[in-house]
């Protein structure tokens, strides 16, 4: 198994800043905007976007945490640890995740989101888009496009969970 770091902590910070600027530019008003991080690493990325928005615009967006496990089509988990401490009805929700691959995680996140209410609009921000979609889903905000083969894996590490910030490609062969 070969592991190669392709994004270091500085580059990751820049990618998150780029996503944050794109969110500012593409949304006429941030007043109706909320962030929903997809557990686990998407939550930490959403918090970083929230912090950058606070630094750049002086606004603190509400942030929630989506647990997609109970909504997956490939596993059966009953417990839902979603924490959405605000009403999403009529809100512009930006889902935040670490990697966009087949689209199945995002489908499950949308299923969870609409079970909580009816947002006005749903967008998607991802740190890495690696391609290989199985569902018609695309990200509105992308930190890095990293094409991979179908056997390779993208591993995102965040300091809050893993002790460092980086993105690596793992080749299992």
Swiss-Prot record:
Role description: Regulates transcriptional attenuation of the pyrimidine nucleotide (pyr) operon by binding in a uridine-dependent manner to specific sites on pyr mRNA. This disrupts an antiterminator hairpin in the RNA and favors formation of a downstream transcription terminator, leading to a reduced expression of downstream genes.
UniProt GO MF annotations: RNA binding; uracil phosphoribosyltransferase activity
NCBIfam families documented for this protein: PRK05205.1-4, PRK05205.1-5
Database matches in InterPro entries: PRibTrfase_dom, PRTase-like, PyrR, PyrR_bifunctional
EC number, as in UniProt: 2.4.2.9
Originating species: Streptococcus uberis (strain ATCC BAA-854 / 0140J)
CDD domains named in the record: PRTases_typeI (cd06223)
Alphabetical GO biological process terms: DNA-templated transcription termination
EC class: transferase
Alphabetized UniProt keyword annotations: Glycosyltransferase, RNA-binding, Transcription, Transcription regulation, Transcription termination, Transferase
Protein name: Bifunctional protein PyrR
Catalyses which reaction(s): UMP + diphosphate = 5-phospho-alpha-D-ribose 1-diphosphate + uracil
């Amino acid at each position: 198994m070969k592991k190669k770091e392709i994004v270091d902590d500085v580059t990751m910070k820049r990618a998150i800043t780029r996503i944050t600027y794109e969110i500012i530019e593409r949304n006429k008003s941030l007043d109706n905007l909320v962030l929903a991080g997809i557990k686990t690493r998407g939550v930490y990325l959403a918090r970083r976007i929230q912090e950058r928005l606070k630094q750049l615009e002086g606004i603190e967006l509400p942030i929630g945490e989506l647990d997609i496990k109970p909504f997956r089509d490939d596993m059966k988990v009953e417990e839902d640890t979603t924490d959405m401490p605000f009403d999403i009805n009529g809100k512009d929700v930006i889902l935040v995740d670490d990697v966009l691959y087949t689209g199945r995680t995002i489908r499950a996140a949308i299923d969870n989101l609409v079970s909580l209410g009816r947002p006005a609009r749903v967008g998607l921000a991802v740190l890495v888009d690696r391609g290989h979609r199985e569902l018609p889903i695309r990200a509105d905000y992308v930190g890095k496009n990293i094409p991979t083969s179908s056997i390779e894996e993208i591993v995102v590490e965040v300091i809050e969970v893993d002790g460092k910030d980086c993105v690596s490609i793992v080749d299992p062969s």
